[in-house]
Amino acid sequence: STPIKSSAASDVYKRQPYVVVFYVVNKCTWLYQYCRGSTVVDRLMVLLMNYPLAFKKLLPSMKLKSLVAGTIAAVGIWAVVYFKGKNGKKFRQGEEYGSARWGNEKDIAPFIDPVFENNILLTQTERLTMNSRPKKPKYARNKNVIVIGGSGSGKTRFYVKPQLMQMPDNVSFVVTDPKGTIIVECGKMLARGTPKKDKNGKILRDKNGRVVMAPYKIKVLNTINFAKSMHYNPFHYIRSEKDILKLVNTIMVNTKGEGEKSSEDFWTKAERLLYCALIGYIYYEAPEEEQNFSTLLEFINASETREEDEEFKNAVDLLFEELERDEPNHFAVRQYKKYKLAAGKTAKSILISCGARLAPFDIAELRELTSYDEMELDMIGDQRTALFIVISDTDDTFNFVVAMMYSQLFNLLCDRADDVHHGRLPYHVRILCDEFANIGQIPKFDKLIATIRSREISASIILQSQSQLKTIYKDAAETITGNCDTMLFLGGKESTTLKEISETLGKETIDLYNTSDTRGQSRSYGLNYQKTGKELMSRDELAVMDGNKCILQLRGVRPFYSDKFDITKHKRYKQLSDYDKKNEFHVEEYMKHQMEVRLDPEEQFDLYMYEGSELEKQSNSENEGTEHVT
């Protein structure tokens, strides 16, 4: 109803001038009939002298001549205005060559949440609300962010850390941590958490009056030092044959086979068949404790082939034959039969390529890391969690493990949102992908980033230059950037990035002042003022941008040229190790503290209990001090 009323009021306002013309001419025509004079000029002079008499009565005259004269005058004025406007020139003074300008406080105000913690911190003065459904839908923006900054521009300090320091009540974090410094500097703050609140937003206290805290559950995958990592088993998250195909695809995309043949289409398809068959068998037939990469390696090692004996059957062949007798249409059997169509020599080449692709799992530490699972990836959207993924910024040997985790994470969270939570996770999951180019390729990421918004998932893609994204995702890079409503540029000098940013900032119109000095027989001077267009910020200006400044572009809003966020002004800065080394987070101690003994109700085992000086005595006699626990 409000828009209709507003439109009607606007129409009335536009018609007012013509109503006034009709009224004035109507009243003057009525008075003119009573004016005496020998000529028209005399009568008009009398009319002007007695002009106020026409308006003694407010209502217009209803005589025919007065009505006709008023109507003709109003229509005539309307026609003049209409045709003049239709044929008139369109001027946009000050915007002849472009209307670009920097945004201000008024431009960003509708996008900021009044509760400071419920915002994404972008610059010192600009923030974006975490609320995905604001009161006015026109201010809704997705929370996907592209952060671009060269080495040393402060991507971690000015963007990643401020997000973690916010610690909103209903947000979980997944953080890529190059070198493993972020968890050390911010982990203690997250493990402490924030005051727990009730439904009304009131802080809860225990019986002693102390504030009840809501800590983050810390998870760590460390591909630099496996001893500081929790266990991650990709097999644990297989729920169906569809998940098997996704896992195999991730392995194939992020690892390399052996020799020239491994890159050919036939060989990769053959490898995929074997992986699907073996992983399918392990998932459906192997006990839970054997569902891991170690078992997969054992299967490949046992898949012996003999070129001279096509009838030879290895141990794996016998297992699949037995399974085929019981379930002829089993997924693993169907895949394995296709693989077995290859001749002995071809099968041997396939096995060599598979072995080379999984060569990193020959390392005992990696097999141990993937032997069972502690990550609970599917529960990150159900509980307050901070998952740190530590990767090396110099060696990408184990980055395929990280790519596997991210691929499974996105799919698991989307499936859980749809199947359990009616399309929206209770905790918004913010994925902060620092050094995104080092992670590897996440399959179908261009499609995932377009659909995760509605499930309460967002991704911050942090790069050194836009060309890094194009190198990995090729043509899909533009789709990925197009699905990020926010772009934050912290500085850099890569030419392609500077060119694209300069173009998207647009052009402004500036005044140009020229002088001329002509010398000849008679000397003359000239001054010339004109307008021209100039980039809001040219490539060379972007390249020498102040180190404390950044550029923020939010969809549908003018760009902002602002100071980078100063973390020392944040109220939780004192909880970081940046402020005090005592706040450093020790991962090993936390992992020991979090260890839980999981008991099987039907399993019996011996529990040995030792106390102080009795330790040496107890070690010499196994049966003393033993309790039988059920």
Model regions: which residues?
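Single conserved hydrophobic/aromatic residue that forms the stacking wall/gate
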Residues: T2-A9, Y13
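Canonical alpha-helical transmembrane segments of integral membrane proteins
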Residues: D11-K27
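P-loop NTPase motor domains
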Residues: F22, K89, K136-I457, I472, ...
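Juxtamembrane/interface segments at transmembrane-helix termini
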Residues: V24-C35, W78-S99
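Alpha-helical membrane-embedded segments
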Residues: K63-N87
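N-terminal pre-Walker A segment at the start of P-loop NTPase domains
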Residues: E105-K136
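Conserved ATP-driven motor cores of ASCE-family P-loop NTPases powering translocation/secretion/packaging/pilus
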Residues: I449-I551
